[in-house]
Amino acid sequence: MSASNITLTHPTAFLLVGIPGLEHLHIWISIPFCLAYTLALLGNCTLLLIIQADAALHEPMYLFLAMLAAIDLVLSSSALPKMLAIFWFRDREINFFACLAQMFFLHSFSIMESAVLLAMAFDRYVAICKPLHYTKVLTGSLITKIGMAAVARAVTLMTPLPFLLRCFHYCRGPVIAHCYCEHMAVVRLACGDTSFNNIYGIAVAMFIVVLDLLLVILSYIFILQAVLLLASQEARYKAFGTCVSHIGAILAFYTTVVISSVMHRVARHAAPHVHILLANFYLLFPPMVNPIIYGVKTKQIRESILGVFPRKDM
């Protein structure tokens, strides 16, 4: 063995298994995965193009939606191309530093998505509870600051992880029992004391999910109070109708996060592929359904999409 290999504390590459125990079904599993990824790409790119092209959609709600679409594109594209390469071509190898980069992007953009969903809840709160101050509160400057804060929080919380993982000696082999480089899946291969990584990873996840979800719920408590005080049922229906798309996006994101986290800790003796499939569902489902939710439930988006197709006079 050469001297350069002896000094390495980490392998030059990892091997991603895919879905443990279901390797013989990879080609079939790839079909819904590929379909979901294609829908995510088409849907989110369409949202971005329409919001950019239509000046009437350059409002706070749609600017936050554009942020969400961009995040969903990066989030799904960070894992799905490599995942499909595993399923189709058995291309399981991933460079050590590419693995760390993938892990950083996946976890960072998940945190950014949570922040943007919280910002969208704040947008709905101001629109319904303080409608006369909406344009004064949600200025372009504030929206930019919110976007920068979402990025800064995610990068600050996730930057330590790649550096911590570089310090470990990986004596348990290079095989990761996963479809992508998830933090805890990589930590399991490391020797030595990994307790700080374990605690830090869980603490960050709990902090983000609990804090953001509580603030979202609090926003909707105030929104519900304001809606119930409206004079007519039609006004109440119209006001709350503007929140339906956001509630759908919230449920799509947090439900999958919570189910995946609970199953990972409660059903520890479940087959490995159950946890991996749930983790993939969390990665695929929100980016796929968010454009559909907003396209169907938001009149301005729906009209902009239909306006792309020329109508023939009868």
Curated annotation (Swiss-Prot):
Source domain of life: Eukaryota
Any one GO molecular function term: G protein-coupled receptor activity
Membrane topology: Multi-pass membrane protein
PROSITE patterns named in the record: G_PROTEIN_RECEP_F1_1, G_PROTEIN_RECEP_F1_2
UniProt topological domain (Cytoplasmic) ranges: 49-56, 123-141, 220-239, 297-314
Spans traversing the lipid bilayer: 28-48, 57-77, 102-122, 142-162, 199-219, 240-260, 276-296
Disulphide connectivity of cysteines: C99-C191
Record keywords: Cell membrane, Disulfide bond, G-protein coupled receptor, Glycoprotein, Membrane, Olfaction, Receptor, Sensory transduction, Transducer, Transmembrane, Transmembrane helix
Entries under Pfam families matching the protein: 7tm_4
Extracellular-side segments: 1-27, 78-101, 163-198, 261-275
Subcellular location: Cell membrane
Glycosylation sites: N5
GO CC terms in record: plasma membrane
Function: Odorant receptor.
Entry similarity comment: Belongs to the G-protein coupled receptor 1 family.
Protein name per its UniProtKB record: Olfactory receptor 52K2
Annotated source species: Homo sapiens (Human)
